[in-house]
Structure formats: structure tokens, C-alpha cells
From Swiss-Prot:
Membrane topology annotation: Multi-pass membrane protein
Pfam families xrefs: Pex2_Pex12, zf-C3HC4
Domain note: The three subunits of the retrotranslocation channel (PEX2, PEX10 and PEX12) coassemble in the membrane into a channel with an open 10 Angstrom pore. The RING-type zinc-fingers that catalyze PEX5 receptor ubiquitination are positioned above the pore on the cytosolic side of the complex.
Annotated positions binding Zn(2+) 2: 385, 387, 406, 409
Subcellular location(s) of the protein: Peroxisome membrane
Subunit structure comment from the entry: Component of the PEX2-PEX10-PEX12 retrotranslocation channel.
Protein name per the record: Peroxisome biogenesis factor 2
Amino acid sequence: MVDNYNNNNILPTNTSTTTTTNTTITPTPPLPPPPPISNILDNNNNNNLIKNDIKNDKVAVSNSNVRPSSSSVSYENSDWNKVYNSEREKLHEVNKQILNIKRPSTSIVRVSQLDSARLDEEILDLLRSQFMKIFTFFKPNFIHNFQPEINLVLKSVIYKLSIFNLGTTYGNQLQNLTYRNEKAFDPIRGSDQLNKLTMRQKWLSGLINIGGEWLWTRINRYLINNNWSEHPPNDIRKKFWNFLNFAESAYKALALLNFLTFLFNGKYVTLVNRILHMRLVYAHPTLSRNISFEYMNRLLVWHGFTEFILFIMPLINIDRIKSFLYRLLVKTSFGNSSGNNNNTASNPLQQLQKQQLLIQQQQMALAKCPICMNDPISMPYSADCGHLFCYYCIKTSCMIDSSFTCPRCNSLISNIKRFSIQD
């Protein structure tokens, strides 16, 4: 009877035998624990295999009290080990298939990348316009002579505070973009992996974009000021001039080719970014892109309102409205003044003083055109009421408004005539 059977396969002693001979039974080598394939193998099959092994060992021990040599089941030839090997091969095949699967590439909206570049340019222009106000009282040619150095300082400051410190520009931050070291990117780890730029990439990008532009501008100015293009073709200066022109044309052609490639795959906006493997990717891939049409709606409303005003303005006679309001105000003031005159009729001295004051004001006013206030009146014309106007003023007012009234006496003007001293 078997009392216990542990993992070390220690054989139990047979208590039913009467033999007094002490035999030493060497235990079989311990089996290593099976690898973790419980998710693949069926538990019932494992239990059946273990029970069969135990029965075979018990039969072998009961027949002979010595260690079995040829009848024992070896570890390499056991059934569960064969199943394990077959399942492991299947897992290796699945792993190879997973590695060979082409992962989806990182797709960045091209419009966002172009908008970020445009925002960076506008930030630079804004700072430049503010910075140029410092040199308002300098010599006129100072800004022209040191324009490359001013741009160098401004771009260096912006580059230090943006890409060098943050790894991205301010325009990229507004578009949820950042630079990624595409050379160190591993596609197997997924497109969400973000490799920061190295110091070498940052320094080279600054030297090429900022220092290279300044050096190129200075060289061109020096060559133009010294007339290197007018030397003979065999002169070394002329050859150097031709080489620079060829280099500039080649750079523009490569930049155009890079831009067309960018429109095709959307990877690198500029040629320098492609050379240095600096690609723009989303800083937060899971961030939702909220699009607000509030500004667009407001712009459309004001645009429609402006078009309506421009359409209706020619149909409105502004001068006629002004004349109507003026007549209304004059009638109101005239009625108030007449009421006051009735109240003050009892005081003849005050009434005489007011009449003299009104005569002086009228004499001063007659020297000016009541419409344009020009002094002296140009080509004076008199109306039905006897007041003088400039010919252009009175003629235009009567053509615009057929019921035009005199601004001085509020009487309707129907005829005008040339004023002369004999009149």
C-alpha cells in the first residue's frame, strides 16, 4: 500500500513482505517542475498522465525492490513533455507572426504642421516689430546694416526658450505637436512612443537654421557690395559666385522635393528636419481635438452685416436727413426764443442789446458759407432768402435734396443766382 507520493518520487517501503534482507532503494532523479503552460494544456489530461506514471512506478517497484533501469519512463520521452514541446513551437510561430505584422504608421495632420510653422513666423514678426522700435532714433541705415544680426539675436532667444528647453516650439504647442527623435524610434513598441531629441540634434538644428541663415546673408551682402558677379569668368571670385548660385538653386530644388514628399507622407516639414530625423508627432495622442466655430460664425455674421450696409447706404440720402434734423432743431430753438422775447418785451433796454448782438453775429456769419464754412465765399451765389453760399455747396445741396432749406433762416430754397455788388 502506498502511503504518499511526493514530487521527489521517493519510493515507499513494502510493509507486506516478510523478507528480512535490507535493500537500499536509490530514488529516481527529481523531475523539474513543468513550465507555465497551464493556459495551453488541459488540466484533465495532466491529471491522467500523472496517474498513469504513478501506476507504472508502483508496478515496477512491486516486481523488484531495486531501482528500475529500463522499465522507468524517462523525462524526455514522457507524454506531457511532448505536448509541451509542440505547444511551445506553436507559441514561437505566433510570436514570429506578431513581430512580422506591419504596425500602423504614425499619421499626423499636415494642416496642423503647416499651421504651427505659420504661427512661429508670426511670433517672430511680432517680436521683431516690437524690437525695432528701440532703434527709432538711430541712424536710418543702422537697421539695414545690422538686420542679419538683429534676426540672429531674436531667433537665438526664441530657439533657446522653445526647442532647446522644451523640445518644441510655441506654435507646435498650440497645435499639440512636439519633436520626436525618429532615428531612435522603435516601431515594435508602438506609435505612442516618444523619444526626445538629443543635444546633438538640438545644436545642429540651431546652427543650420539660425547660424546658416545669418552666414548666407552676410556672404551674399559682401559679394554684392564688392561686385564679384562682374568679374571675368576665369576669375576665382566669379567662379565662387557661380558656385553659390548653383548651391542656392540646388537647395531650393531639394526643399521643393522635400515639401512634395511631405504632402505625400506627412513626415518632415523642412529639409533640415529630414536630415536630422526630427519629426513632428502628437504630444498627447489621446487628446481630443476640439474644433470651435465661434470665431467663424462671428466673422460670417459681421461680413453679412457689412454687405447689407454697403447695399443699403446708396439708397439713403444722408444730407436730406441732416437737413430735416437741422430744420427741426432750428424750429424748436426759434419757438423757444420767441417765447422768451414775449416774456422780456417789458424790458426795452435788454431787447435792444439782444438785437444789436444778433446783428453783429449775422454780419460775422455772412462772411462765411453756411454749408462749408469757407471764408471768403468761393463764387458767391444768393438764394431766395438773400443769404450767400458757395456755388458748389448750394448747387450740390439743391441737387441732392429738392426741399433744401437755408441753414440760416430755414426757408425753402427754390432758385439761386449769381451775387453781384449792384444787387
